């Protein structure tokens, strides 16, 4: 198993640094997993994975706060890759391939965050936009899978 989940250097030095400096939504250095998963959700909503170029470690895979998400990362890997060819189902145990895929979707999500931050320089408007996106992702999930979630009306 790889030792880190990676993000691009561009994002580390760009949007992630900006969010760290503003301590936006409490996504500080102690909650890297939350920030990564939020970017992942935005990337999945966008629908296009973006390959990482010049990446660095962002989350150590041995951290306890990321381990509960391994099943989620494998589920995404199954949904996006393995479901098209179920004879490869044994590859579901290949966590490194799952990490690579979620890194690509999170990479897209960080681009989405960067664009939002650029378009909404006002911190309050940016915060409202982020909360709106979280709500929309939650509603889409609820509708798609027929489950009630925290924000389901």
Question: What are these language model-derived features?
Answer:
Residues 23-27:
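Short pre-active-site segment immediately N-terminal to the catalytic Zn-binding motif
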Residues 1-14, 18-22, 49-153:
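Charged, low-complexity intrinsically disordered terminal regions and linker tails
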């Amino acid at each position: 198993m790889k030792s880190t989940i990676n993000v691009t250097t561009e994002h580390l030095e760009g949007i992630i640094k900006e969010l760290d400096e503003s301590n936006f939504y409490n996504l500080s250095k102690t909650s890297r997993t939350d920030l990564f998963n939020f970017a992942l959700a935005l990337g999945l909503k966008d629908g296009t994975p973006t390959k990482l170029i010049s990446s660095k470690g962002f989350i150590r895979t041995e951290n306890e706060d990321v381990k509960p998400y391994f099943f989620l990362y494998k589920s995404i890997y199954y949904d996006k890759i393995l479901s098209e060819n179920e004879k490869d189902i044994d590859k579901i145990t290949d966590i490194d391939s799952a990490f690579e895929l979620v890194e690509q979707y999170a990479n897209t999500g960080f681009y989405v965050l960067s664009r939002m931050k650029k378009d909404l320089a006002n911190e309050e408007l940016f915060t409202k936009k982020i909360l709106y996106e979280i709500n929309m992702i939650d509603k889409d999930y609820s509708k798609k899978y027929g489950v009630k979630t925290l924000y389901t009306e």
